[in-house]
Amino acid sequence: MRKTPSHTEKKMVYSIRSLKNGTGSVLIGASLVLLAMATPTISSDESTPTTNEPNNRNTTTLAQPLTDTAADSGKNESDISSPRNANASLEKTEEKPATEPTTSTSPVTTETKAEEPIEDNYFRIHVKKLPEENKDAQGLWTWDDVEKPSENWPNGALSFKDAKKDDYGYYLDVKLKGEQAKKISFLINNTAGKNLTGDKSVEKLVPKMNEAWLDQDYKVFSYEPQPAGTVRVNYYRTDGNYDKKSLWYWGDVKNPSSAQWPDGTDFTATGKYGRYIDIPLNEAAREFGFLLLDESKQGDDVKIRKENYKFTDLKNHSQIFLKDDDESIYTNPYYVHDIRMTGAQHVGTSSIESSFSTLVGAKKEDILKHSNITNHLGNKVTITDVAIDEAGKKVTYSGDFSDTKHPYTVSYNSDQFTTKTSWHLKDETYSYDGKLGADLKEEGKQVDLTLWSPSADKVSVVVYDKNDPDKVVGTVALEKGERGTWKQTLDSTNKLGITDFTGYYYQYQIERQGKTVLALDPYAKSLAAWNSDDAKIDDAHKVAKAAFVDPAKLGPQDLTYGKIHNFKTREDAVIYEAHVRDFTSDPAIAKDLTKPFGTFEAFIEKLDYLKDLGVTHIQLLPVLSYYFVNELKNHERLSDYASSNSNYNWGYDPQNYFSLTGMYSSDPKNPEKRIAEFKNLINEIHKRGMGAILDVVYNHTAKVDIFEDLEPNYYHFMDADGTPRTSFGGGRLGTTHHMTKRLLVDSIKYLVDTYKVDGFRFDMMGDHDAASIEEAYKAARALNPNLIMLGEGWRTYAGDENMPTKAADQDWMKHTDTVAVFSDDIRNNLKSGYPNEGQPAFITGGKRDVNTIFKNLIAQPTNFEADSPGDVIQYIAAHDNLTLFDIIAQSIKKDPSKAENYAEIHRRLRLGNLMVLTAQGTPFIHSGQEYGRTKQFRDPAYKTPVAEDKVPNKSHLLRDKDGNPFDYPYFIHDSYDSSDAVNKFDWTKATDGKAYPENVKSRDYMKGLIALRQSTDAFRLKSLQDIKDRVHLITVPGQNGVEKEDVVIGYQITAPNGDIYAVFVNADEKAREFNLGTAFAHLRNAEVLADENQAGSVGIANPKGLEWTEKGLKLNALTATVLRVSQNGTSHESTAEEKPDSTPSKPEHQDPAPEARPDSTKPDAKVADAENKPSQATADSQAEQPAQEAQASSVKEAVQNESVENSSKKNIPATPDRQAELPNTGIKNENKLLFAGISLLALLGLGFLLKNKKEN
């Protein structure tokens, strides 16, 4: 640790005064300290400004970038991990003042003011609302463990005339028969002898339990039920210390935690069971997750328990109870596992399955004793056996349950449920593998229809006119077929008056248990023009109408699978994500387009840009039919800034998995045109040597009814009681169910076979079971062997309640090499991400663990195990959240309206892009990431902050380090409901180097990086063993000035052909020096492929931002480089000249004077080689391959003996000449002064020793 001058001075005075013989030693020791200071192994120019560039001979001036208002006039956007209203601030519950921490060891039990204490041996029953108005005519009839069971029905009940009232409602106290009392049974009746509530009972969970509550539906609880739409989280600590204890929560809640992590909601309100927080819930909430936090701690220790809590029974409970760091979530305030039945399903002809709140401690004989099953006639059905699944919290009853047409009634104690027909039973009885959908034949003269709906009583097809989708032509009944199918053939005999069915529309009319619905064919191949604004008109408009089409006859007939350039395996892919409308909605290119903007056809006109950039695959945001949009207005440009209520959509609200949306068609009213136009787009992508990846959304639908109307309680994952599970407002498709899995696989096969696509990206893939995704992959690869699949592998699997299975998430990667997942670990460490988005990360000045960064760069993320580099999608930006440019601005708190800040943001952006494109695995680029795309809300009315009720939806208000808002401070994240003004791809910024030099420089930089990546296998290694053998960390933490957490990294890769590459990144705000030692001395002979201004596959003649030093390599602030040493130890010919800026640039900064940088000293040539020992990260890296050792040795010798003339032939001059090109750091002068001081101190030390020797 460096001492302060005053501290050092004090120590020295004490030493001279107190010691004689030690004085010389102190001086000699001081000289050694100074010697060490004179020879640092990694140095920093601490005063170097962030935007420093090398002091070139030809200094130019950088023009301030044009403001977006010159080219923009439009609207705004949105967010994935939070609901559409995530912009709202976290609601604070009105809470009682917090009391001082108590040392009590049990929860607070203060009674409600209006409530009298409960006498010993009494049990209080609270009633929210009496069944009838006349309380005097109602009573509580009791039996079981009460002192005096009620007698003389009905008048022998405890009369509510004597009931007392509190804040909740009425209550009566019942005397128990003694301490052994365990069960209190009761009902509310009236004097007329009517049982008003049905039989109820409550089990005493613990001896001290002395009250229970009935809600308005007369369900029994061990706590006071909360108002609808609220859950209370109670937290009891035995130490009484609630200081800085808080809750971080998400899920089906109105306002998920969204403050800066880990600033959760504090436990401040005090209640009967410790502290509590009331959380408002979404409508029909089912589950939420949370973390208990201790904000007095740091890092991961802030979590009281490291694992997420998840509560999935919000339908049945409005309070939960937590205790200390107990892993359990209790549904009673006594912290015991309360066995309650929560649902029942008919799962097979010999089995019924019931779900329970818990089965901890449950015994088979007790379950049998307290269970009862009756059929629809009320007759008891014998239970022959029970199987208890404690982990799954379910009991399977065995018996004769062969009646599959009617429900059964299952009861356990006072809990009673009517069975729902489970998907298991439907799979066992009705699963079908034949052809489904509408098959148009005989030149349109015939249509074969097949629909699967086993519970339907009747099915008809309603046919609509081809020129007027609202006009009914006629209705034809379908006939019941095998295994739950309904079939019909439409032709001239159906009396519809149609000779050619092509282009006509249809829906299915399904009658079931007296209810009729109109449903969309899930296998429809095209649709009528869709307008979700009409959904409320009637049933015919709440879902789209399918169209009779023959896709095989539409579009280019020569369409085939793509032959993708520079691509053999998934590690070779460079994926570029784009939205069809965004790519051509910029009004700046309106005159250049010959086709309507925002369409498949217009996209074709800009494909050459992507070909020139060098990407291998274009990933299109969802192009299949989505719900919330008006396709009839797709031609209207949304030029005003808006971030809500826009006729715009990303497409993550699917309506059909076979039909394309009409939003990107030149004529949405023509159901054939969208098919032909999309085929043409794929064909043109293939002609340019690129592939097409479709973003698909099988994890949820836009509306639950889309599939529930087809077959209730089947297509979705189910809760334990048999109701469908939801997500984002729609249903979670249950891909473990046979017909749902079939739908997914059939859809994938159809899209590959019909449109010849080259891959799929699965939205929220972790919501699916791994088996279904694997099956889809194999089916698709059987058609297109070059196809790739990737997905969001977040751990979000819900599945059917209490039926765990292997999910298609990040944890699956160690078991498969078929599908890849996005790495949030590299994203979060390089630029930040949920829940810490906007906090400084590696490329934005936040120090990060160097080993963690290195592991991510070699496709070994720290939060999941990848057994192949191809398992990992390397990315730092996607359509979700803020763009990369915007998140950098937010993180460094610098307003891009200032030219110097704009340039700095781009420097950091280029660092991030370089790290992703030189990483192992598969790189992924968000459209516009290459040029610095922004979604800044540049409406003149929003140039400064506005009132809270005027804040744009899904926006962040950005401020600088002083707290001042940016110019136009609102930036939109998740722009799925924003206008074209917000979402457009800005072609001027991407291509006009004169108006936007920084943007075009960044774009060209990425183009060069892609070319570099594709020029060698070094960055595309195919196995972990290859990576282990060929990639070595240079910047080992704890050595050579590299800290454990730092903002620099350097590593070396040996390509399969023997070429050696090295990547160095300095994300610091000052220059940093990298010590190469002996192990990496051969890099001195390298050519530079990337510097601070450009990148490519050939050497740069005059690289900028770096210089060789005697210890190694020095990089300017915010600079990265890629080096290459060819196989034979000589560099490739350097041909890339440094391109002059397209506009005059800002004057270069001169390095500060030496005295301003006392620690920036250049290593001296006389330092022993012992300080340059090899240092590498992997265990086997201490021994280089013999050829590499020989090469390193020869390269080092060559560097030491190289003449100036010879070095000038390389692309980096030798050190003497280099000083003329790069800023003079003053290091030599500093070294001379230091060594003079060292010599003087050493002489003084010797003098003291000699003097003392004589005196002694």
Swiss-Prot record:
Feature: compositional bias, Polar residues: 79-90, 1200-1210
Keywords: Calcium, Cell wall, Glycosidase, Hydrolase, Metal-binding, Peptidoglycan-anchor, Secreted, Signal, Virulence
PROSITE patterns in UniProt: GRAM_POS_ANCHORING
Regulation: Inhibited by 4-O-alpha-D-glucopyranosylmoranoline (G1M).
Region (Disordered): 42-117, 1126-1224
Cellular component terms (Gene Ontology): cell surface; extracellular region
Residues excised as propeptide: 1226-1256
Residue numbers binding Ca(2+) 1: S646, Y648, D977
UniProt GO MF annotations: carbohydrate binding; metal ion binding; pullulanase activity
Binding-site positions, substrate: 141-143, 153, 199, 248-250, 261, 303, 308, 652-653, 728, 794, 824, 827, 834, 881, 954, 974-976
Gene deletion effect: Reduced numbers of pneumococci relative to wild-type 48 hours post-infection in the lungs and blood of the mouse infection model confirming a role for this protein in invasive disease.
Signal sequence range: 1-44
SUPFAM superfamilies given in the database record: (Trans)glycosidases, E set domains, Starch-binding domain-like
Listed Low complexity bias regions: 48-61, 99-111, 1181-1194
KW Nucleotide-binding (keyword) present: no
Record GO biological process: carbohydrate metabolic process
Gene3D superfamilies given in the database record: 2.60.40.1110, 2.60.40.1220, Glycosidases (3.20.20.80), Golgi alpha-mannosidase II (2.60.40.1180), Immunoglobulins (2.60.40.10)
InterPro entries assigned to the protein according to its UniProt record, in alphabetical order: Carb-bd-like_fold, CBM41_pullulanase, Cu-Rt/internalin_Ig-like, Glyco_hydro_13_cat_dom, Glyco_hydro_13_N, Glyco_hydro_b, Glycoside_hydrolase_SF, Ig-like_fold
Membrane topology category: Peptidoglycan-anchor
Comp. bias intervals (Basic and acidic residues): 1134-1172
Binding positions for Ca(2+) 2 per the UniProt entry: M813, T816, D817, D867, D871
Entry-annotated residues carrying Pentaglycyl murein peptidoglycan amidated threonine: T1225
NCBIfam families: LPXTG_anchor (TIGR01167), pullulan_Gpos (TIGR02102), YSIRK_signal (TIGR01168)
Record text about domains: The N-terminal tandem family 41 carbohydrate-binding modules (CBM) are involved in carbohydrate binding. The C-terminal glycosyl hydrolase 13 (GH13) domain is involved in catalysis.
Family: Belongs to the glycosyl hydrolase 13 family.
Record-given protein name: Pullulanase A
